[in-house]
A protein has these predicted regions:
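Active-site-adjacent beta->alpha loops and helix N-cap segments on the catalytic face
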Residues: 2-6, 26-28, 54-66, 85-91, ...
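Short, well-ordered coil/turn segments that N-cap beta-strands
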Residues: 10-14, 42-45, 71-75, 100-102, ...
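Conserved, mostly hydrophobic/aromatic
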Residues: 18, 46, 96, 169, ...
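Active-site pocket-lining/capping segments in soluble small-molecule metabolic enzymes
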Residues: 5, 123-148, 161, 197-250, ...
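Active-site mouth loops of central-metabolism enzymes
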Residues: 14-32, 75-87, 144-161, 237-251
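Active-site glycine-rich loop that binds ribose-phosphate moieties when present
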Residues: 128, 157-174
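Active-site beta-loop-alpha junctions enriched in small/polar residues
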Residues: 19-22, 49-53, 78-84, 107-110, ...
Length: 289
């Protein structure tokens, strides 16, 4: 089952979800409970992240395959080249094939020392996501890639370089992109407009994160190179009650999603943190389901 580029509800934007492979049985139970809730509002597709270690790769394969089998939802397995040889990456793709997975999100991945650390080449490895796109396309996968409206953490604010990289991925066969989460609709639309000027037709699905934990948000923003606007700092300043934080986070996400939908985005991609509560409420409030 390949990833749809149009909503199951004709004429509407898609909505899609990202999960991570649980580390234990408790986490896995939470994931399946979240998916059970999400099935009620019919996401168009889901993706599952991928770590550099072999155990995490195996979990990604198993969880992604089981989601397809148990829910019937189109699924995307993440794929990175961190710390892997070309042969090892080819074997991962073969594992995906055997598991019935037809879609991958091709990412270079963060250096093992952190997203801003120098890239360390793996002997006989792959060092750029565009090479990964070519390899996955050769193996018959539908391939998505990442986009960064706030700039890639490793590019040092060189947006021209970011655009060149994304265009090369498209040239090599990528058919869609999902973005890192961000908080400015204006930045997203400026990013897409510049990409279109350069000839790209790639659908760019904006990534949205429901804020439920401020410390986790800061950690993820630092890892992904996403600036947190001063007004968000002000909103959460002095707020310690988890329920209030969740309510504020939902309001922020609803406002951003409405701005994006009014601007004509092809869909919305939610970073769920393996929980249905906030994302389901946001999707319902913005009228996607």
């Amino acid at each position: 089952m390949s990833v749809p580029l149009a909503s199951r509800n004709a004429g509407e934007p898609t909505f899609s979800l990202e999960f991570f492979p649980p580390k234990d049985e408790v986490g896995e139970e939470q994931l399946w409970q979240a998916l059970k809730e999400f099935q009620k509002i019919e996401p168009d597709f889901v993706s599952v992240t991928y770590g550099a270690g072999g155990a995490s790769r195996d979990r990604t394969t198993r969880i992604t395959s089981e989601i397809t089998t148990r829910t019937g939802l189109p699924t995307i397995a993440h794929l990175t080249c961190v710390g892997s040889t070309r042969d090892e990456i080819c074997e991962v793709l073969q594992q995906y094939k055997r598991a019935g997975i037809k879609n991958v999100l091709a990412l270079r991945g963060d250096p093992q020392a952190g997203p801003r650390a120098p890239w360390v080449e793996t002997p006989n490895g792959i060092n750029h996501a565009d090479e990964l796109v070519s390899l996955a396309r050769t193996e018959g996968f539908t391939v998505g890639v990442a986009a960064f409206p706030d700039g890639h953490p490793a590019s040092g604010g060189n947006f021209s370089s970011d655009f060149d990289v994304l265009l090369e991925k498209e040239r090599r066969g990528a058919t869609f992109a999902t973005t890192q989460f961000f908080f400015s609709a204006e930045k997203y639309f400026s990013f897409v407009a510049e990409l279109r000027k350069r000839g790209s037709q790639l659908p760019i699905y904006p990534g949205v994160i429901p804020i439920t934990n401020v410390k986790r948000l800061h950690r993820m923003a630092e890892l992904g190179g996403t600036p947190i606007p001063q007004e968000l700092h002000a909103i959460f300043d002095g707020v310690d009650d988890p329920k209030k934080i969740r309510e504020l986070g939902i309001e922020i996400a609803v406002k951003l999603c409405n701005q994006l939908l009014q601007g004509g985005v092809p869909g919305l991609h939610f970073f769920t943190m393996n929980s249905a509560l906030s994302t389901s409420e946001i999707v319902t409030r913005i009228g996607l389901r």
